[in-house]
Amino acid sequence: MTRTTRRLRECADRGVSVAILFVLSACGSGGNVSNSRNVAEAKNNMSGVKATEDSAATAAAPSTSVRTPVVLFFGTSLTAGLGLDPEQAFPSLIEKRAKAEGFPIRAVNGGLSGETTAGAARRIDWVLRTPADLVVIEGGANDALRGLSPDAARANLEQVIATIRQKQPRAKIVLVQMEAPPNYGPTYTRNFRTIYADIARKENVPLLPFLLDGVAGISRLNQADGVHPNPAGERIVADNLWKSLKPIVAQLDRNPGSG
């Protein structure tokens, strides 16, 4: 049992409904109230798409300069950075970290609060208007919080990968491990956890460690909702992801003639 899982179980033992906290916050407070907010958030997060497309086109033209690869972070409110300024969200932090270590990238935040994997499978086609060299997929948390079928989540995530390969066959793809809270029982939690390794094997994509490892269940690293990381927690998320992403980012094509 991981430290994160133990903390989630301790919260549940104290009478705190982890699932309810997750549903109220990670799912964008639910229902119709969040729909307009989610749409606005998506537009805000993707406001740089046109600029990215123009920059990518410029980078693709013959030049003596080094091309800057585009990394698309596609996910939920955890990717969007709900409750944080855009520059505090982990995609922006990773962009800064990559540049500081000599591997400049252009990070595009494609996070959307409250989105299930079914929504992700529908939205990915639109998001892929952004030319990307690498797509980082974070999805499934909202499925788990609602107790939705792990098999359905698996199929939806596989569809996301299939769409990326169809629309942008040159893009590299990585999948991020997500976990379910313990409220639905050990069988559901186990079945949900295993879909990610299954997808990674079937689709031959790298599987990154649990997004919130070392952050989930630790109050000082999360916002008041107890779910979404605060700036300190977000820095840990970014550090953890970068450890896995760095060797992949280092191999991205920076040839000015590509793109």
Where are these regions (language model features)?
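C-terminal motif of bacterial Sec signal peptides marking the signal peptidase cleavage site
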Residues: 23-26
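N-terminal helical cap/lid subdomain that shapes the substrate entry/recognition surface
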Residues: 118
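N-terminal propeptides/low-complexity segments immediately following signal peptides
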Residues: 35-47
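Serine-esterase "nucleophile elbow" of acetyl-processing enzymes
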Residues: 45-113, 123-131
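Bacterial signal peptide processing site
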Residues: 28-31
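Bacterial N-terminal signal peptides that target proteins for export
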Residues: 2-16
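Hydrophobic helical h-region of N-terminal Sec-dependent signal peptides
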Residues: 17-21
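Alpha-helical cap/lid subdomain in secreted, periplasmic
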Residues: 103, 121-259
